[in-house]
């Protein structure tokens, strides 16, 4: 009798906020940092629950998914999906011992999904660095030759890969080489994704990794930044707060299989 009541009533105990040590997050096959993120489960029966992902999906700070519940041997599983803009978010998770383990995927259906050749030449890359801060704006002449030498002098092609799983990737082929090199493994491990928010293409970085990235930037170019009177805080002002992520907004112009990325046309400074 007791067993019957506990097994049929346990679903009511699922309804709570799972965060910190009570939640595990995996995007596809990659473990995601949980700081600043949470999963809220609200079970309405032993078969149904709503699952809310907070600060987990770049497209929206809070994504609610209607999920089907099943119980076996004290473990509840939940599955469901929801569409946010042009992104289909799917979850498949378990709750056992008060811990929610959530595996989720993003599947982008946008027309920008694909492998794009970066259009070579002066118009290929633009940066939104007309900030009104003269120290940042004065960096443009320094950046132009640096990026020009880095990219076009040493590679024969640059591709921006925008796969449907939402992981941002760039690959390039060094002159004389027969194979491409890329940053896909790094962007996957560091959860560097892309999304479309309010029609704007954004490259997004998990806030938990921004500290690491800014530290590396400080180590690599801190003296140059300091000499120019620029702080990491000034750079951060160029980013958009997307909840669990920071986004760098860019416009994307497609011409056949080639693409050009640029900032708001009113604020464009060609970098190359």
Identify the residue ranges that each predicted region occupies:
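Buried hydrophobic residues that stabilize the cores of well-folded domains
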Residues: 56, 71, 115-118, 141-145, ...
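N-terminal glycine/threonine-rich, aromatic-flanked beta-hairpin/loop signature
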Residues: 23, 30-66, 127-245
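Beta-sheet ligand-binding and adhesion/scaffold domains
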Residues: 73-112, 120-122, 200-272
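Acidic/polar, low-complexity intrinsically disordered N-terminal segments immediately downstream
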Residues: 1-139, 149, 167
């Amino acid at each position: 009798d007791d067993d019957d009541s506990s097994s049929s009533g346990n679903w009511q105990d699922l309804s709570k906020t799972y965060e910190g040590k009570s939640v595990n997050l995996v995007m596809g096959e990659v473990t995601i940092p949980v700081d600043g993120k949470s999963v809220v489960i609200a079970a309405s029966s032993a078969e149904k629950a709503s699952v809310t992902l907070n600060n987990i999906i770049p497209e929206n700070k809070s994504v609610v998914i209607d999920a089907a519940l099943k119980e076996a041997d004290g473990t509840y599983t939940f599955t469901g999906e929801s569409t946010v803009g042009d992104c289909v978010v799917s979850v498949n998770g378990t709750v056992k011992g008060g811990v929610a383990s959530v595996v989720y995927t993003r599947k982008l259906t946008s027309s920008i999904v694909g492998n794009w050749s970066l259009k070579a030449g002066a118009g290929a890359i633009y940066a939104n660095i007309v900030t009104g801060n003269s120290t940042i704006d004065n960096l443009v002449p320094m950046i132009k030759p640096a990026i020009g030498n880095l990219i076009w002098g040493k590679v024969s092609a640059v591709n921006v890969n925008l796969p449907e799983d939402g992981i941002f990737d760039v690959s390039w082929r060094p002159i004389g080489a027969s194979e491409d090199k890329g940053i896909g493994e790094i962007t996957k491990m560091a959860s560097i994704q892309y999304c479309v928010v309010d029609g704007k293409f954004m490259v997004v970085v998990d806030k938990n990794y921004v500290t690491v990235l800014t530290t590396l930037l400080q180590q690599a170019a801190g003296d140059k930044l300091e000499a120019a009177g620029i702080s990491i805080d000034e750079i951060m002002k160029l980013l958009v707060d997307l909840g669990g992520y920071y986004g760098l907004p860019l416009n994307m112009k497609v011409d056949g299989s080639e693409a050009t990325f640029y900032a708001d046309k009113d604020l464009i400074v060609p970098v190359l």
